[in-house]
Amino acid sequence: MIKEFCAENFTKIPQAIQKGANRIELCDNLAVGGTTPSTGVIEEVLAYAGEHSVPVMTIIRPRGGNFVYNDIELKIMHTDLIEAKKLGTDGIVIGCLTEDGWLDEEALDLFIETAEGLQITFHMAFDALSKENQFKAIDWLAERGVTRILTHGGPAGTPIEDNFDHLKELIVYADQRILILPGGGISTENVQTVMDTLKVTEVHGTKIV
């Protein structure tokens, strides 16, 4: 069972690991859904988590808001990805879309190639796709060796329990080609229900431990 703790900077990480978090998604600025953490934060978290054999997934996201990025933002993301890889992150968390509601294939191809050797999570930008495109995106991301997709299974703010049916559809369709990682609204109180209902071995959240 992997409980991925979504952390804003370093502060809560020691306590989370002590309580049983066995993977970290590292962000800054969770008020806007998480943005790229600073070099200093990445370094300190990798050092601490490394001592406890806990892998770290570093989010690469230049700002809050939507997931459609211009050329300068994509360049910033690419530089940040290279830096996080140099620092020794175990994986990266990315997601970028086009204006017309599909994956930004060109940008993602570059990021996936640059991240070779790292785990890759495609984040909740996935939830901004239409349901039809979500299934196509599973194919596209799985073909390129992306490790997992983080998804709430429905609109942000809905109880995750309301989205179990769609999450089950995604899990069945993914068919172990790529891992579906449920997140958003999972806490210590419902984590066992989520795992039992969806038959998943990995879950994600800020209140997961």
Swiss-Prot record:
UniProt xrefs under SUPFAM superfamilies: CutC-like
Main location: cytoplasm
Induction: Induced late during copper exposure.
Coiled coil, from the record: none
Subcellular location as annotated: Cytoplasm
One GO location term (cellular component): cytoplasm
Pfam family, one: CutC
GO molecular function: copper ion binding
Superkingdom of this protein's organism: Bacteria
Reported consequences of knocking out the gene: Mutant shows a significant increase in the intracellular copper concentration after 90 and 135 minutes of exposure to copper.
Keywords, alphabetical: Cytoplasm
Family classification: Belongs to the CutC family.
Purpose: Might participate in the control of copper homeostasis; data from other bacteria suggests it is not involved.
PANTHER family from the UniProt entry: COPPER HOMEOSTASIS PROTEIN CUTC, COPPER HOMEOSTASIS PROTEIN CUTC HOMOLOG
Descriptive protein name: PF03932 family protein CutC
Organism: Enterococcus faecalis (strain ATCC 700802 / V583)
Phylogenetic placement of the source organism: Bacteria, Bacillati, Bacillota, Bacilli, Lactobacillales
UniProt gene name: cutC
